[in-house]
Amino acid sequence: MRVVILGSGVVGVASAWYLNQAGHEVTVIDREPGAALETSAANAGQISPGYAAPWAAPGVPLKAIKWMFQRHAPLAVRLDGTQFQLKWMWQMLRNCDTSHYMENKGRMVRLAEYSRDCLKVLRAETNIQYEGRQGGTLQLFRTEQQYENATRDIAVLEDAGVPYQLLESSRLAEVEPALAEVAHKLTGGLQLPNDETGDCQLFTQNLARMAEQAGVKFHFNTPVDQLLCDGEQIYGVKCGDEVIKADAYVMAFGSYSTAMLKGIVDIPVYPLKGYSLTIPIAQEDGAPVSTILDETYKIAITRFDNRIRVGGMAEIVGFNTELLQPRRETLEMVVRDLYPRGGHVEQATFWTGLRPMTPDGTPVVGRTRFKNLWLNTGHGTLGWTMACGSSQLLSDLLSGRTPAIPYEDLSVARYSRGFTPSRPGHLHGAHS
């Protein structure tokens, strides 16, 4: 079957790889000159299935009000003037109760665990290199309340069979030796030994090269104008004067998926702006061994070979990609506070990206009401964590095979009742 994939981020390229391996003739289209040059370029570097959790959580509405008055708040909201943003935020608020949180986190962990397993198989089969490490993740708590709240997430981990260690502050250095210098600032941590790390951009670009060698065609520097449809079928992708045709089409445009599907399929995917710093390592014994997640500031600090990646924060501000100095100051503050000798912060590269988020935190994966239009988008801050699993799942569904995990609740159909986002018309040209 001929398949066109829209988007060459980690999700689009992983989709291309798995569909190619299933025997399909695959073409990838992207406006950028190469793979992984937007949201997949400089994310936090964590592959953390156990920490897969929605931003929509109990207590978040009250915290959001408090964060409005804090300099280093992990979440910020600025109205963009669209009804779509308001409806999206309302649906997110409706997911902030305990029952929705547990349901959403449960399916996110399910997909993320499966994705890590798929990555392991891919790594074993191809020996793909991406500065990957398998040292686990350590979530750090600064208050006793955070330490006590960890029991809620532990229940989900136990249900999913995810190994963990709940550590007091005196034991944090057993996992991350450099934290011995700052343990007095912390109340403890939750360690997930099976989590991994790696450079998402390096992985995506190397996988794209492997996919191209295997027969996948990449059309870079090719802005997409619109999808062409007739009845319940998509019959082409209009790119300037050219129409690219296939038997099936996969939407993996990330945050731009919603606008590109305008008038065809409504999906509740909204950009969640995040930031990162990439820092050269200064002192080896002062740098992280693997990756940590600061629960207070929602910031991850991840070790690559000779670099430290510091990433996090969430801004609900539309498609704004301005690099804001206060956000850089927050990232610098956290990494200096936890790893004061770790990196040359003054030499850091500052970056921002738009993570495609659904109100419940779970991606939309599967077929739409159009027989040949498929979705693999809306992974939020977990695109790197979920890419291989959601792409293997998509390949299985499109190929008529039975997937290895339950998948019905990943479909966009879960939004068919009670939430139909208005189409963001002024964003229509965002990808073209």
Swiss-Prot record:
The keyword Oxidoreductase applies. It holds the Pfam family DAO. GO terms for cellular component: cytoplasm; plasma membrane. Its cofactor is FAD. GO terms for molecular function: D-amino-acid dehydrogenase activity. GO terms for biological process: D-alanine catabolic process. Its EC number is 1.4.99.-. SUPFAM superfamilies: FAD-linked reductases, C-terminal domain, FAD/NAD(P)-binding domain. It catalyses: a D-alpha-amino acid + A + H2O = a 2-oxocarboxylate + AH2 + NH4(+). It comes from the Bacteria. Keywords: FAD, Flavoprotein, Oxidoreductase. FAD binds at residues 3-17. Pathway: Amino-acid degradation; D-alanine degradation; NH(3) and pyruvate from D-alanine: step 1/1. Oxidative deamination of D-amino acids. Belongs to the DadA oxidoreductase family. This is D-amino acid dehydrogenase. It comes from Escherichia coli O127:H6 (strain E2348/69 / EPEC).
